Amino acid sequence: MPSRRNVLKQLAAIGALAGLGNLPGKAFAADGANPEESALASANTPFHMPEESTFQTRVWVAFAASAAIWGRDYKEVQATIGRLVQAMVPYTQVNVLCREAEQARARQLCGEQNTRFIVAELDDIWLRDTGGVFVQNGEGELGLVDFNFNGWGDKQEHEQDAGVAELVSKQADARYLQSKLTGEGGGIEVDGNGTAILTESCWLNSNRNPGMSKAQLEAELKANLGLRKIIWLPGIKGKDITDAHVDFYARFVRPGVVVVNLDNDPESHDYEVTRQHMAILKQATDADGNKLELHVLPPPLDGRDNRFSRSRDFAAGYINYLPINGAVIAPEFGDKAADSYCHELLARLYPGRDIVQINIDPVAAGGGGIHCITLHQPA
């Protein structure tokens, strides 16, 4: 599988964008902040991150592709986001963040059925990473953890995107909770019952959490997300802008059941990495001591040949799908056998849900997928 988003590393700062104006500063970053709001480091925090396929209130996307980042492809990327929104709205409400100057185009491409458009200042489309992580507590209160997005270790301009999580929390009427850690939502996979799968290459990285030990990082993540156990995969540093987010390697379907990416292209750097991950997951147990049931979902080997798929960053991974109410939204890459297997496997793993596959080649050329550009809000 080609690497992800290398092409974005060299981007210069983007000019000011039309929108809401400057977002307020981080609410609880300073020492001595309100302990009720910022004490995410406490092991007794009532908040936990639900498993993704549980019932959702809505899905968020960022209609933010620009020529500054995407060059000549930005209109195709915008159209792909519109196609994704239209695939989701029969099943769930979609909130679309967009720049003020692009509202008309966003409405044209996304449609206005079951959608809400929110003006925001944005750098890029990767809302899974910029929008924070929704959590809940035992009283049904919704929270949102801000993991202090820093452009995947200052690899990309992120002045506007650094404020998106706080914006989302306000728009969702969720309690804003700021972590001590720096990371991204695409780097977190949970079963909703206390177990998470993470990659060391992403979280134990000096470009995000310098000087922090594994034990310190685990303690903070467990407090932030209500975890009892973390299964660590090695990942791989420096091959893509994210340093190997877990949402391209392993996904929980429900507690005890995991979909695993196994790259069968011997020329891919992920060929060995995914086999290391498989070996670890075969031996792993969840927070309750149960072995994991693993299902392999390999990338396509014979997909469409176009200018997008020829990008060295083309992310041809089915595993980056999104479960929503009544459906699973997944990519198709023009490899008939692989596309069909993806559909068949997801139909077995998510019974009773429609499996909707769409062409995401323009987004995949930027190194991401459907999961990367969406943010689900639990009910």
Where are these regions (language model features)?
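Secretory targeting signals
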Residues: 1-3
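The feature marks the mature, well-folded catalytic cores of soluble enzymes
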Residues: 32-379
